[in-house]
Amino acid sequence: NTPFRTKFDDDMAKFSGNAGIGCISDTDPQPLLVRSHLGMFAISTVGIINNAEQLVAETFSGPGHQFMAMSSGKINTTELTAALINQRGSLIDGIRYAQEVIDGSCTILLLTPDAIIAARDRLGRLPVLVGRNNDGLCVSFESFAYHKLGYQDHYELGPGEIVKMTADGLTQLAAPGTKMKICAFLWTYYGYPNSNYEGVNVEVMRYRNGEIMARDEI
């Protein structure tokens, strides 16, 4: 129960509904609420867009586009991702388009009036895990985050896979790809010891790496 969580204690009593998304971002204020021809949705992303300037220039080349959210003088990459999604006729086609044109990594979480849509980046550099308990589903970058809340591992998205979560369960909207380039630093540096990625526990992997390093020194 960190100071970050307690900041929202008073707000929780005012919330209604049965779904929500959130993000702790080092760079961009998010989630963002977007109203477009695709309807209203909230969006949160995690990753690095290497060709952001190119995509911004291409988006500005058409009429009716503007970016409002700025972070340190730069375009908010979550807003850029939303702009890419809005260039197609449906949320799913828009997500697939964003996955296709983004150079780098971008995992996407959308909240619509009736569902949560999760999309792992096309090469699976970052994990997306779904937990489940008797009350519903949750989705997270780290499995330990929902373990502490009483959820059990339910599903792990593959590269580029898109799923929809509702009160009725989990539905696959786009099948996973075959190419996987998951970030190795998840096990060696970034990951929480209790977390599992692609079925491999972070703490177990670190002990194994230590054994290999020690063996090579003998």
Enumerate the language-model features and the residues they cover.
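Conserved short alpha-helical segments that host acidic/polar catalytic motifs at enzyme active sites
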Residues: N1-P159, K164-I218
